[in-house]
Curated annotation (Swiss-Prot):
Residues 213-232, 399-421, 485-509, 656-679 are annotated as: Disordered. GO terms for biological process: protein ubiquitination; response to UV; transcription-coupled nucleotide-excision repair. Pfam families: DUF2043 (PF09740), UVSSA_N (PF20867). Residues 667-676 have a biased composition (Basic residues). This is UV-stimulated scaffold protein A. One of its GO terms (molecular function) is RNA polymerase inhibitor activity.
């Protein structure tokens, strides 16, 4: 029974399932119910399982403990007597011994254990004093919040609080830096936005800005101007109506000048039309307010001149920005360049900075004017980017302009302002004529030919050209690259140049064929001449560093050096002869080796003559191969011929162990079977990016290679700087 009990506990705790198997659990309860000894034995088995470094095994063991705790007084007594150890293994009250992985199962175990302790205290707390003490110990000393869903311990809570405080401090510091940056950059951002808005207005005026071309008259001047215009435009207006000529918007009378006469009033009273009644009702308020009302004729004229059917409706004009396209020309190039520069600045610098400010303020929990100002800046920047996109600017083709250095004349003009005029000295002759040079004791100056002058001019020009080609910012460098890519012009002229000395070239080739060029030594180079004194050295009788008589110097000839000048090594490889024979050693698949090595095959050793079947022709070679074959068979294991699958079938049929478990195929290691395959493999779970990098970086071979490379670097440095005191100590 004890063996069966241990087997059941092992199977239940190593199943790796979140719920216990009901059949085995029922059998375990039945065995524990049979005697107190079995129950005590089950308690010790479960306590051993709780000590395992695997959260799934502990969780399954805790579930068994929970089932037995609610059914047996003896089991409760045993568990409460060692309650502190139980809490350390399930709740993790000892921060030095945390719960083992997997982490999710460990968290689940802690929550279930805390809930179980709370339930046991409510149900059995009065009967078991140690249980009540354990509950209060968790609540008061370990500060375990039984209402906390995550069931965190004090150490975990403290760690999280400290981590949160550190994060808050970091975010506050970043928010302060962001506030400082915003205060420094806000003025620049506002200036850039104003510049973009002004450029937009210059490129495309706002259709709803009606005062864009107004002259800005003062009120008094405007009223007087209106009166003069109305007085002057009245006769023209009447004339236009009578002559039925096309009118202009400037000639249309304003509503205030359309005065209703008495005659019009009588006509209006006589005509009783519904539309006119509605019109009278609408204009009644205008009459009461003192504003002149239009008559019938004036109203019809007003409507006809303005192209309106009635003045009671409004027109909504929608201007689509999809068809807008601004083309760059000579007039707006400067404006477009300014807009493009400002757009690049906003897109690459200002908008990312503002977005980072908003993110930092949000993380730091700032909800005051700083966040509102940042959001306002972001909205304005995004609106400017949208407007730039809607403008749909088409740029002209831009050519690369290379900035060249200013000429010498320009430098002289700039530097002339820095010089002070000085009067010339008396008797100073910058140029002395040729007939007076003898009097001054000077030689005659040789006359330069025109060719020399031309050569000097060409040299200066080529020098300046070379300097321009070396300068990567100059256009000459670009032209040089293009010329290099083009086919060489001299290639076309080479055939014409080679046609002239064709006979000389043929003669040279014939002579070279007769007498090929070979390397030679110095003795052949100076053949028939005085040989160089390479082997002679000066010998000093005195070995003192400073005091040595110069008269006693004597030359000593070193025979070894002179012999080295006259000796040479000539290697004769001979004529290449291709290999015609083959290895023809028998292969495992029955074929013959087709390698054509000259002396030795890398797989079958020295090449020997064989027949068509691969059998050695010489008797000695045959005897040697037979001996090697017997030795190889003796060293091979006896089980090589056995097939593991066939042996397992024979074992299953006969029931006799033929040793199939000992064989593991050809040349392979026997894989270790997992002890508990249903549990989560902790080693496989730890296969993270960090662990994989650790395997590669801290591999023994890699560490050895790194150490070897570093030692070589140190050795090279030591050899290079060994005589310097600064590096000798390193």
């Amino acid at each position: 029974m004890d063996q069966r009990l241990a087997q059941l506990v092992e199977e239940l705790t190593t199943a790796g399932e979140p719920q216990l198997e009901p059949g085995r659990m029922k059998e375990l309860k039945k065995i524990c119910r049979s005697s107190e000894e079995h129950l005590s034995h089950a308690y010790h088995l479960l306590l051993t399982r709780l000590h395992e470094e695997h959260a799934e095994m502990r969780f399954s063991a805790f579930q068994i403990v929970q089932e037995l705790f609610s059914r047996s007084h003896l089991f409760r007594t045993l568990l409460v007597s060692n309650f502190q150890e139980f809490l350390e293994l399930t709740v993790g009250t000892d921060h030095e011994q945390p719960l083992p992985p997997p982490r999710e199962v460990a968290q689940k175990l802690r929550k279930a254990a805390i809930a179980a302790v709370q339930g046991w205290h409510e149900k059995y707390g009065e009967a078991y004093k140690k249980l009540s003490l354990g509950y209060h110990y968790l609540k008061q000393n370990k500060k375990v919040d039984f209402q906390d869903v995550h069931a965190r311990t004090v150490a975990e809570r403290k760690r999280e609080e400290e981590k949160q405080k550190r994060l808050d401090n970091v975010y506050k510091e970043k928010a302060k830096r962001a506030e400082k940056e915003m205060a420094e950059m806000s003025q620049e951002v506002a200036g850039t936005l104003t510049e973009m808005e002004n450029c937009f207005r210059l490129l495309l005026p706002d259709p709803f800005d009606f005062t864009v071309n107004s002259t800005g008259l003062e009120p008094n001047e405007q009223t007087s101007a209106d009166e003069d215009r109305s007085a002057s435009s009245l006769p023209t207006y009447v004339g236009c109506v009578d002559d039925e000529q096309p009118c202009c918007s400037k000639d249309i009378l304003p509503i205030s000048q359309c005065v209703r006469t008495d005659q019009n009033e009588e006509l209006a009273d006589k005509q009783k039309k519904p539309e006119q009644d509605l019109l009278d009702g609408d204009t009644c308020s205008e009459v009461e307010s003192g504003v002149p009302v239009l008559g019938d004729d004036d109203y019809e004229t007003f409507v006809r001149n303005h192209g309106l059917i009635s003045h009671k409706y409004a027109l909504d004009l929608e201007l689509s920005t999809a068809d807008i396209k601004v083309h760059e020309n000579e007039d707006n190039t400067a404006v477009i360049n300014s807009v493009a520069d400002a757009h690049k600045l906003v897109r690459n610098k200002f908008l990312p900075s503002v977005q980072s400010w908003i993110q930092l303020f949000t993380r730091a929990g700032i909800n005051d004017d700083r966040l509102r100002c940042a959001i306002d800046l972001k909205n304005r920047l995004e609106a400017a980017l949208r407007k730039y996109k809607e403008m749909n600017i088409s740029f002209k083709e831009r050519k690369r302009k290379v900035m060249k250095a200013s000429d010498d004349g320009d430098d002289d003009d700039d530097d002339e302002d820095d010089f002070v005029e000085v009067p010339e000295k008396e008797g100073y002759e910058p140029h002395i004529p040729d007939h007076l040079r003898k009097e001054y004791g000077l030689e005659n100056c040789p006359k330069k030919d025109e060719s020399v002058k031309k050569d000097s001019c060409s040299l200066t020009k080529t020098k300046q050209k070379n300097e321009d080609e070396l300068d990567p910012t100059c256009a000459a460098a670009t032209l040089k690259l293009i010329r290099d890519k083009l086919p060489n012009e001299s290639a076309t002229t080479e055939p014409a140049a080679l046609e002239e000395p064709d006979s000389k070239r043929r003669k040279l080739e014939e002579e070279r064929a007769k007498a090929p060029l070979m390397p030679f030594g110095l003795d052949l180079h100076y053949w028939g001449q005085d040989q160089p004194s390479a082997g002679k050295i000066l010998k000093f009788t005195s070995e003192h560093r400073f005091w040595a008589p110069s008269e006693v110097e004597e030359e000593v000839e070193n025979k070894e050096i002179t012999e080295m000048l006259k000796t040479r090594y000539i290697t004769f490889a001979g004529k290449f002869e291709p290999v015609k024979h083959k290895c023809r050693a028998p292969m495992p698949d029955g074929s013959l080796c087709e390698r054509q090595d000259r002396i030795k095959c890398p797989f079958h050793g020295k090449i020997i003559p064989r027949d068509e079947c691969g059998v050695p022709i010489n008797a000695e070679d045959r005897a040697r191969e037979e001996k090697m074959r017997f030795e190889k068979q003796a060293t091979q294991p006896e089980t090589e011929w056995r097939d593991p699958e066939f042996m397992r079938e024979v074992e299953a049929a006969t029931g006799v162990d033929l040793g199939s478990s000992k064989t593991n195929g050809k040349g392979g290691k026997k894989k270790g079977k997992k002890k508990y395959p249903n549990l989560t493999d902790l080693k496989q779970q730890a296969n993270t990016a960090r662990s994989r990098l650790e395997k590669i970086v801290f591999n023994k071979g890699a560490v050895k290679r790194v150490v070897k490379a570093m030692n070589q670097m140190d050795q090279r440095k030591h050899e290079k700087f060994a005589n310097q005191f600064n590096y000798a100590l390193n």
